[in-house]
From Swiss-Prot:
Species: Salmonella typhimurium (strain LT2 / SGSC1412 / ATCC 700720)
Pfam families tied to this protein: BPD_transp_1, BPD_transp_1_N
Keywords on record: Cell inner membrane, Cell membrane, Membrane, Peptide transport, Protein transport, Transmembrane, Transmembrane helix, Transport
Chief localization: membrane
GO molecular function: peptidoglycan peptide transmembrane transporter activity
Signal peptide positions on this chain: none
GO CC term, one of those recorded: plasma membrane
Name of the protein in its database record: Oligopeptide transport system permease protein OppB
Entries under PROSITE patterns matching the protein: ABC_TM1
Length: 306
């Protein structure tokens, strides 16, 4: 098992390096600069600013300097927020996105798996049709449509919940963005769990367990659930990426001070160092999470190690 974990870690290093390299050159070769806005600066002022941030250095010099910065954990200065470094901005916004993303992910897994298992056990009944109807609806409606609808219903019409803001991560401020962010993944996980559970329940080893007279509850939780969750586990990697990218829209709609909104503001203001750093951070988290999923998959199904 340790050998498998080490192999996955070693595989992640070149992937992260390629991500950093591609992201850096795409940002540096993009047209415009952080200092070309609606108000044109005099050429000498622009030259002095670019010299201050070493933007007029050869691109390979900038690249190796950036790698050296990253090796020391320094994301560099922000071009838009002059009084803060990128590290300061990330440190302030990352806990918001992490809390929202973790809550949405857990909600999607818990409700999605539970609904999928119920639908499989109640196949071709009212319960099954209800879950699958919800799943189809949740998959086709994007989060940027769900989010304002939730605000209109629960914040404006019923006035049960606030329609935006963070307020230190209080639960009532998290409910609407958490539901909007997780709804599509609840639906997808429910569909995957249902299909996988139905397949497992028709397996020979489940028939054998039933023939031995084992209680249905024990058959489900001791024998059927574990193999049925393997496809769900495979889906968790893409789901995690989707929740991270989806948070950019959700945080903007609900006015949450997370890395999603920070990324959007950085992109609109051409803040190269901020956008590049957030891209690398999200990419690194994605690589890390996929590696964790692979390890969990190997724990459940030892055949995957070889």
């Amino acid at each position: 098992m340790l050998k498998f974990i080490l192999r996955r870690c070693l595989e992640a290093i070149p992937t992260l390096f390629i991500l950093i390299t591609i992201s850096f050159f795409m940002m540096r070769l993009a047209p415009g600069s952080p200092f070309t806005g609606e108000r044109a600066l005099p050429p000498e002022v622009l030259a002095n600013i670019e010299a201050k941030y070493h933007l007029n250095d050869p691109i390979m010099t900038q690249y190796f300097s950036y790698l050296k910065q990253l090796a020391h954990g320094d994301f560099g200065p922000s071009f838009k927020y002059k009084d803060y470094t990128v590290n300061d901005l990330v440190a302030a916004s990352f806990p918001v996105s992490a809390k929202l993303g973790a809550a949405a992910f857990l909600l999607a897994v818990i409700i999605g798996v539970s609904a999928g298992v119920i639908a499989a056990l109640k196949q071709n009944t009212r319960w099954d049709y209800t879950v699958m109807g919800f799943a189809m609806t949740g998959v086709v409606i994007p989060s940027f449509v769900v989010a304002p609808l939730l605000v209109m219903v629960f914040a404006i019409t019923l006035q049960w919940l606030p329609g935006g803001g963070w307020n230190g991560g209080a639960l009532k401020f998290m409910i609407l963005p958490m539901v909007a962010l997780s709804l599509a993944y609840i639906a997808s996980i429910a569909r995957i769990t249902r299909g996988s559970m139905i397949e497992v329940l028709h397996s020979n080893f489940i028939r054998t367990a039933r023939a031995k007279g084992l209680p249905m509850r024990r058959i489900i939780f001791r024998h059927a659930l574990k193999p049925a969750l393997l496809p769900v586990l495979s889906y968790m990697g893409p789901a995690f990426v989707g929740i991270i990218t989806g948070s950019m829209v959700i945080e903007t709609i609900y006015g949450l001070p997370g890395i999603g909104q920070l990324f959007v503001n950085g992109a609109l203001n051409r803040d190269y160092s901020l956008v590049l750093s957030l891209t690398i951070l999200v990419g690194a988290l994605t690589i890390l999470f996929n590696a964790i999923v692979d390890v969990l998959y190997a724990v459940i199904d030892p055949k995957i190690r070889y």
